[in-house]
């Protein structure tokens, strides 16, 4: 079974190299053929060169909408299993082994636990973020940083809904759940805590309250979604290295 790893990226030169090294090292332990596609969304830095230096495929787009970027990667992919991994997310080999076992066991898709790197994050901010991730896991909602689906199920579900500029992974998860079993893996991925460092607690709370009050209309426009779309990046990668990374 060919596995396609799809990595959307916008100005990710700092973190992308370690993400790809770790992902490829983990994928090689599966003894399954795989491809990695970095979907470069009009980056102004060395994202494309970093991806090319890692020996993976690069798809150039100019979309500025994460659902559309992921869908573009899916259309370009050749695999029977589509795996969406954010450019700031490290995927351990045990997580990929769990994913493969779930799919071979009949799951149409799934996700994993999500942990933040936690470096330089205020303790209570990290606690709230981890609580949110735990609640999503308990509710079987996969984070967009790591989500997998059989191609047949992904296409039957309509892919990521491009009416939305955020929360698109939740809508896809609900659609996949109507087609079969959605597996939440006990293993985890490690994603960057940069948003917890680059945004104040007040900014994060205001963003969450805005979404809670306005609901779906709030995520149908890019305006007001600075938490996801303002493009802030850190100068160094502080994520702890994993095996192969």
Where are the regions a protein language model picked out?
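A conserved acidic beta->alpha catalytic loop
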Residues: 22, 40-48, 89
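Short aromatic/hydrophobic "clamp" motif used to bind/position activated sugar donors
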Residues: 82
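Acidic donor-binding loop at a coil-to-helix junction in glycosyltransferase catalytic cores
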Residues: 166-172
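Cell-envelope/extracellular polymer assembly enzymes that use nucleotide-activated donors
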Residues: 2-4, 35, 171
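Short, well-formed alpha-helical segments that are part of the catalytic scaffolds
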Residues: 12-27
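Conserved donor NDP-sugar-binding/catalytic core segment of glycosyltransferases
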Residues: 93-121
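Glycine-rich, basic loop-to-helix element that forms the pyrophosphate-binding segment
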Residues: 61-77
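Acidic donor-binding/catalytic loop of UDP-sugar-dependent glycosyltransferases
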Residues: 46, 85-101, 174
